[in-house]
């Protein structure tokens, strides 16, 4: 047998066997079958709402099905297993059979279609499509569709993720075809995607720089430095220039001159700060200058100790 004919024959056997089981097990709630060929024989799994009716009393029904399948389809050592469907609302074949039974009992087709669609979606399906075709309300045949959720109609995903069931409802005006297509919950569709939420990355807070520990000598010099600034006299204001007509020059206010003891104390207090100060020597004189805490100081001649340059010296008496 050519390979093409073998595939056609296998498909015919499977479709014919499915119709046979649907006819024989309609009262048991037939929900589809699986056919697996193995070296040990042919394994057939029947899904049913009532597996007890598939097996029958003392296995009578299942033995009859096994004999009929072996003789009708020439299968070697067929083994039939019955399994229960826990959620019939997600089985397309069962829902199609229920829809056909509802229409045969006299339900209006639109009410039956909406009830079937609602039951499937409430069970958690991603999508469902119910199609009823035939003489619905008049002499002409027409098609009514009820769709909810997401349904694939073409491509390879139709064979992989879409469960399809079909049943026939026989009425006085004629037969009605009932088709139900379901996409099971949890199925990952090929065109599905997820949008990642932007995550804000928090920058670590900068720790304040730790100040180096002060040396004991610097700590002790700080209060002395403040005391020296407080005791230093403010510079005297400049005297106005004498008028040219006045014979005698205007008297100049004498600034307080630090006593030798005070000068020695200031010199002792500030000697520790001279290390970082830069000395400036004035050319042509014995004056030496430096800047301490933003104040220019100098020493020269008879005033051989550091004192502010803004201080007015007492004039030497003739």
Curated annotation (Swiss-Prot):
Pfam families: KH_2 (PF07650), Ribosomal_S3_C (PF00189)
Amino acid composition bias (Basic and acidic residues), ranges on this chain: 198-229
SMART domains: KH
Molecular function GO terms recorded: rRNA binding; structural constituent of ribosome
Ranges of Acidic residues composition bias in the record: 253-275
Alphabetized UniProt keyword annotations: Ribonucleoprotein, Ribosomal protein, RNA-binding, rRNA-binding
Any Gene Ontology biological process: translation
GO cellular component: cytosolic small ribosomal subunit
Bias kind Pro residues: ranges: 234-250
Region (Disordered): 198-275
KH type-2 domain segment(s): 17-86
Subunit structure: Part of the 30S ribosomal subunit.
Matching HAMAP family: Ribosomal_uS3_A
Job description of the protein: Binds the lower part of the 30S subunit head.
The family this protein is said to belong to: Belongs to the universal ribosomal protein uS3 family.
Protein name: Small ribosomal subunit protein uS3
Organism expressing this protein natively: Methanosarcina acetivorans (strain ATCC 35395 / DSM 2834 / JCM 12185 / C2A)
Gene from which this protein is expressed: rps3
